[in-house]
Amino acid sequence: MSEIVKDSLKLKTLWKIYKWKDENDEVSRFLQQGGSIEQAIKAFGEPFGVEEIHGNIALNEGIQLALEIIAGIDTTSSKWSNASAYLGVGDSNTAESATQTGLQAATNKAYKAMDSTYPQRTNQTLEWRATFGSSDANFAWEEYTVVNASSDTGKNLNRKISSKGTKASGESWTLVLQITAS
């Protein structure tokens, strides 16, 4: 009797938001220059909030580009690298759908370039990180994405909705996306 072998690829997604009081953008500058969260805590104290969001939906446009990059079919498009990846946030709570092409907010959405040295890979986990300073994205955070451009004109890999509060001036919020493949 032969053994049945199943092929599968599982992706586990974890979003984290670190919320800092940061009137002078000292924390945001430190993190944007590549300082670790642990170093920021030692230097500036604990964040006033830490949020975790599990899961998301992969968007068709991101899946298709990732497959083309893996196969060498597309060698010219921007990847989700330090040079071209942005984490985006918006205030829309429209349900996720694989056919969406980015954030759904009409006006309140913002994209932030990667903090220095991100994305990073450890074993089977990729991690993107961007820090939104005191004057960035001051609205309700309801939706999240990683995109390979500074707007939804790029290819969005995924989208997640989850209400995590309203960011205000004088605060810096660090958004982290981890995707683990197994």
Regions found by a protein language model. Name each.
Residues 1-141, 148-182:
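Small cysteine-rich, disulfide-bonded extracellular modules of the LU/uPAR three-finger superfamily
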